[in-house]
Amino acid sequence: MSESRWKGALLVAGTTSDAGKSVLVAGLCRMLARRGVRVAPFKAQNMSNNSVVTLDGGEIGRAQALQAAACGLEPSVRFNPVLLKPGSDRTSQLVVRGRAVTSVGARDYIEHRQHLRAVVAEELASLRADYDVVICEGAGSPAEINLRATDLANMGLARAAGLPVIVVGDIDRGGVLAHLFGTVAVLGPDDQALIAGFVINKFRGDVSLLGPGLEQLTAVTGRPTLGVIPFAEDLWLDAEDSLGVVGDAPVGRPAPPIGDDWLRVAAIRLPRISNSTDVEALACEPGVSVRWITDPSRLQDTDLIVLPGSKSTVSDLEWLRRNGIADAIAAHAKRGGPVLGVCGGYQMLGSVIVDDVESGRGAVPGLGLLDLEVEFAPDKVLAQVRGNAHGVPVSGYEIHHGRVRRNGDQPLLHASSGAAEGSIRGAVYGTHWHGLLETDRFRRLLLDDVAEHAGRTGFVTAPDTDVAAIRTAQLDLLADLVEQNLDLRALEDLLGAGAPEGLPAIASTLVS
């Protein structure tokens, strides 16, 4: 197969959220990049509180940053021009080309759609001019036909740009054949004409047993299944959104300890959690068991409590108090137990939060575990950052409205500018920096300190855990799965020629 023939663009849509769109796009991007193809990812609109900061100080969804890494590219706002960050069940912060614009509800958003449609079209056209291949990711499911009129990321994008569409479904959830058929059937004929085939994700067992079902799916839809991706336990880093963060569930695949003791970490699963991926670096370490927790009783036998970031800091702080987790954290800290707060979680650990921006609550008492006062400002801090923590070079990124107006504790680290960052008081640690735990030497120092405070004298940190290498290995595994299990000739043809002419329309009473 001639590598030079890989040219064009396609859209990966899904039967549901968390069906496998993000990982399939990452796998396709990695597979093409390994073949020397100039490839870029694109998600017109993402709804997620897991985000990263680009080199130019913009903000995009973390999944698109991972997909960029799969392509061998730095994150760019071009790859995710519209980002919605939910702050409540009814409102989201609207981020356009990396910058927060306003807070919108569902009805308010309609007012912005024409402008956003133009932004999306411009960015996609620019990427198609600069790269051989652009792999686009849909949002949620195109089957949400109540949203079709305002759709920017699914069939609205495919129709506007003439993109062939592959629909991926998660067989691990059950009912995948019905999901795939139904996704096509509820669409209008013009949308259906762009649906070129299916991919089944997370299959376990003998794939030949699926054959009769796939034959029937082709018979009733007129479209082939282009591949069946097997379930892979080793793929767990960089969850796209909060759907991957399940309360009272383990993070990753814990490896046995090197020494005699495990280190048990409880990460609080906040209702408006953001950048939950911060704790994944801890779960990469042998002998470190990380679980998401929503029940205060589960904190009684933990060694380290982690309060992650939040898109609604004051609201999530009130949730901690209502369900008893705040009291459990205080009791743990009183016993000398280690606590780590990151970004919004760091702000919660302080004495007071003054918030006239997100919640409008004014001065709100924090948990009081750090001598810290934070005040929210309308403009958001967005920056990639570097510094030094106790002789160890560190890096990360900042995404927050809160400004420290007083810090009476020792700093956790110093930024490269010399400015103090974060706090340490006994075994309570806090920082505004996301991604700090991905610095391997710093993470080992922190875990050694946590083990000492927790009395886990038999815990031994691994000397060679490399989070960046683990992430790279997962991207290569994704590419291997794509290469081994998808019809690459059919994908190449779709990229070059678009959806085949004459695909049948499935009659439906739901659409005209």
Swiss-Prot record:
Gene3D superfamilies: 3.40.50.880, P-loop containing nucleotide triphosphate hydrolases. Pathway: Cofactor biosynthesis; adenosylcobalamin biosynthesis. Residues 262-442 form the GATase cobBQ-type domain. The keyword Amino-acid biosynthesis does not apply. The active site is at C343, H434. GO terms for molecular function: ABC-type vitamin B12 transporter activity; catalytic activity. Keywords: Cobalamin biosynthesis, Glutamine amidotransferase. GO terms for biological process: cobalamin biosynthetic process. Catalyzes amidations at positions B, D, E, and G on adenosylcobyrinic A,C-diamide. NH(2) groups are provided by glutamine, and one molecule of ATP is hydrogenolyzed for each amidation. Belongs to the CobB/CobQ family. CobQ subfamily. This is Cobyric acid synthase. It comes from Rhodococcus jostii (strain RHA1). The gene is cobQ.
